[in-house]
From Swiss-Prot:
It comes from Bacteroides fragilis (strain ATCC 25285 / DSM 2151 / CCUG 4856 / JCM 11019 / LMG 10263 / NCTC 9343 / Onslow / VPI 2553 / EN-2). This is one of the proteins that binds to the 5S RNA in the ribosome where it forms part of the central protuberance. This is Large ribosomal subunit protein bL25. The gene is rplY. One of its GO terms (biological process) is translation. One of its GO terms (molecular function) is 5S rRNA binding.
Amino acid sequence: MRSIEVKGTARTIAERSSEQARALKEIRNNGGVPCVLYGGEEVVHFTVTNEGLRNLVYTPHIYVVDLVIDGKKVNAILKDIQFHPVKDTILHVDFYQIDEAKPIVMEVPVQLEGLAEGVKAGGKLALQMRKLKVKALYNIIPEKLTINVSHLGLGKTVKVGELSYEGLELLNAKEAVVCAVKLTRAARGAAAAAGK
């Protein structure tokens, strides 16, 4: 898995919520993003610049984040992002500290491989789930989950329960459809004409 470095500055939390809201608003107005690191001995509140998060957030890849907070380095993963509902700017980011002995839960991108038999017959391949939720030790988690669809015929699907990857536990519903070859209107018309 790729890694990316993000530098932050620790911040203290105000005891009263009105002071906290004012402090967070000031951080955002100055081009910063309030962040929280969970999973360690204690919860760490820190601030990162918008530019420092750009390469981590706006990418199709998944990363192990080398967080440097006031000179102290920890490995973490991006757990959650909150965006402004109108401006689409980043409001808040949660990170989760990695423990090499404990499994983590992450969403991993899905990549389809091969030319499906159903596509050759006039169907259309549709990817229903772009990411799958997996649980494993962080050093086992791949950058992407590859699914070979060359055997997939017209009207056929690949479900989560049919997939297995060594060392990974898939957490999505077993009956959830990952990808399918759907009949196009042209293929339906040709099948109806052939049936007459």
